[in-house]
């Protein structure tokens, strides 16, 4: 078993205790720079409403605001980003999860809270006015400037290094968020009185064209931003080597320890019964059942990148199809409201509800 940095063992065990209030969190867990201004809550210099980077009537909002997306967004995003090697390398080397694992203080709550903050901290960029989106993007860019390293994978030194705030990795962070959201909608969103189904090719291309604004917001290279599904597919082909499973990806370049093992061993060692709700939400649901369902609802390329062979991929697809009644149930009102507050936070709830009112009005 790997040892914690310096061989120290934490003596204060209060970090293990997770109250109901700590689990739910207050607005401060997600909020930066004060309460976010919702899309349409301010005006441009010419007096027209400022709807931010997307706005009512957009295909992105159609996809994002569906109850299925609210419930399953993190599971799908986490799946696709776990196949992009620079993201995994950044978590391994620079994420608070890694720091806590090395210090011996990692808990199931840490895994839960990281996922919990994810959706809610993106909501201001997707559902806020332009200034709100820019300020949150700048904040995340400044944080990600520290997420850089010279080695993506010790087993594949030819891959080079990573830098989360630089154009390539910033672009793929945005694209994996948006593309996984589209899969989610097409695979899980019951709508139009029927089963989940694909958008038309024109609507899919429109989704990508609208997503370009988000890529620009985070600093993606203009000459590579895809505006159609065909361009996105070509981009995946170009960066093929940066996607996929690897047995050495979680190895720390400096010590040779295995981050994944250190994480798992530390969470087991530091378990306290008060962490059970966090364990259920993070491990059993988000990284367990929901992730498995997402595998069946994603692309064949992603299933291959996740290490699934033909047999396991077929089982994943079949399992997701057989689970459609459960998927339908989880996007009903009580369940969606629970996940919205838990995973998007109070500000996220307000942004979603405000955007839904605008979206309904745009289609009336």
Q: What are these model-derived regions, one by one?
A:
Residues 2-364:
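Mature, function-bearing regions of proteins
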């Amino acid at each position: 078993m790997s040892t914690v940095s310096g061989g120290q063992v934490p003596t204060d065990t209060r970090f293990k205790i997770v109250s109901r209030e700590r689990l739910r969190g207050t607005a401060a867990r997600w909020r930066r720079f004060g309460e976010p201004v919702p899309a349409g809550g301010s005006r441009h210099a010419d007096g027209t409403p400022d709807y931010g980077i997307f706005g009512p009537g957009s295909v992105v909002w159609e996809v994002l605001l569906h109850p299925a997306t609210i419930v399953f967004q993190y599971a799908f995003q986490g799946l696709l980003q776990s196949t992009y090697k620079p993201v995994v390398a950044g978590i391994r080397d620079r994420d608070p999860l890694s720091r806590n694992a090395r210090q011996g203080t990692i808990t199931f709550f840490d895994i839960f809270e990281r996922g919990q903050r994810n959706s809610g901290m993106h909501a201001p960029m997707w559902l806020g006015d332009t200034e709100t989106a820019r300020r949150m993007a700048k904040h995340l860019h400044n944080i990600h400037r520290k997420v850089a390293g010279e080695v993506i994978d010790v087993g594949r030194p030819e891959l080079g290094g990573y830098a989360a705030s630089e154009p390539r990795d910033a672009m793929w962070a945005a694209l994996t968020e948006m593309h996984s959201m589209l899969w989610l909608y097409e695979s899980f969103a019951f709508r139009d009185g029927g089963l989940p189904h694909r958008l038309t090719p024109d609507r899919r291309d429109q989704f990508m064209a609208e997503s370009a604004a988000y890529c620009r917001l985070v600093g993606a290279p203009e000459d590579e931003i895809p505006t159609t599904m065909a361009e996105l597919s070509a981009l995946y082909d170009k960066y093929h080597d940066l996607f996929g499973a690897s047995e050495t990806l979680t190895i720390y370049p400096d010590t040779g320890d295995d981050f994944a093992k250190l994480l798992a061993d530390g969470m087991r060692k530091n378990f306290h019964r008060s962490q059970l709700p966090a364990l259920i939400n993070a491990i059993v649901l988000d990284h367990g059942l929901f992730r498995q369902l997402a595998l069946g609802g994603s692309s064949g390329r992603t299933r291959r990148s996740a290490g699934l062979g033909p047999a396991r991929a077929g089982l994943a697809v079949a399992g997701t199809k057989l689970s459609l009644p459960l998927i339908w149930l989880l996007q009903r009102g009580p369940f969606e409201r629970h996940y919205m507050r838990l995973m998007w936070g109070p500000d996220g709830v307000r942004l979603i509800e405000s955007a839904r009112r605008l979206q309904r009005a745009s289609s009336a």
